[in-house]
Amino acid sequence: MATVKELKATARPKAGKGAARAERRAGRVPAVIYGDNKPPVTISLDDKALRQSIFAGHFLTTLFNIDLDGQKYRVIPRDYALDPVKDFPLHVDFLRLGEGATIRVSVPLHVKGAELSPGVKRGGTVNIVNHTVELEAEVDHIPQFIEVDVSKLEINNSVHLNDVALPKGVKPVLREGMTLVTVVPPSGMGEEAKGGADAAAAAAGAAAPAAGAAAPAAGAAKAPAAAAAKAPAAGGDKKK
């Protein structure tokens, strides 16, 4: 079940960069609510409260009830911008959610059981191939994250999307067979296997010339013997 949090907002009558900068100087963050075939609503939010929500994690998969002068808007964040140097929020876009809405969300992947994995115990490493999963979900069933259990994975084993049980009302957007997590071997393991194969190939290659050398030697021994056997017979015919 999706988490729903409360945020208080104030109306922002003016738009534009100048008005947005004025809001930030006043300790507020400009934002907009759009969607559900209704006109956009420009608002501003308390900077401190918004920061807490963003940095608490799972911001883009959290539902919010935004209270604007007593009117409630049920929304989900779709995008936000942070200052590249100081990391404070600059702007947020909220999508208004209608009754029974279904939306696409990018949900983070959480891995559990790595310390129990036989492959990890043998020196392997858990490699997260996809850190997020694109899902289509009913708004009341948006998962905060997708959990993947790797406790039984051997080296070179993987977990695919169709191996994971998704919550009710949730289905994948991309192919179900996509790889989520794999256990990769330690760096030296592949080189050792290659070295063993190279040594076996070299031994087989050395055996082949030796066998070839033995064959001409046998042929050379037979040829003089045959010539010696024929020579006296030829000489005897001449004396007659």
Curated annotation (Swiss-Prot):
* Gene3D superfamilies assigned to the protein according to its UniProt record, in alphabetical order: Ribosomal protein L25, beta domain, Ribosomal Protein L25, Chain P
Output compositional bias ranges, type Low complexity.
Answer: 10-19
GO aspect biological process, one term = translation
CDD domains linked to this entry: Ribosomal_L25_TL5_CTC
| Region feature (Disordered) | 1-23
What InterPro entries does the database record attribute to this sequence? Rbsml_bL25/Gln-tRNA_synth_N, Ribosomal_bL25/Gln-tRNA_synth, Ribosomal_bL25_b-dom, Ribosomal_bL25_C, Ribosomal_bL25_long, Ribosomal_L25_dom, Ribosomal_uL5_bac-type
User: What would be one Gene Ontology cellular-component term for the protein?
Assistant: cytosolic large ribosomal subunit
> Which key words are in the record?
Ribonucleoprotein, Ribosomal protein, RNA-binding, rRNA-binding
One term of GO molecular function: structural constituent of ribosome
Entry superkingdom: Bacteria
Relate the assembly described in the record.
Part of the 50S ribosomal subunit; part of the 5S rRNA/L5/L18/L25 subcomplex. Contacts the 5S rRNA. Binds to the 5S rRNA independently of L5 and L18.
Q: What does this protein do?
A: This is one of the proteins that binds to the 5S RNA in the ribosome where it forms part of the central protuberance.
Q: Which family does it belong to?
A: Belongs to the bacterial ribosomal protein bL25 family. CTC subfamily.
Name recorded for this polypeptide: Large ribosomal subunit protein bL25
Q: Which organism is it from?
A: Afipia carboxidovorans (strain ATCC 49405 / DSM 1227 / KCTC 32145 / OM5) (Oligotropha carboxidovorans)
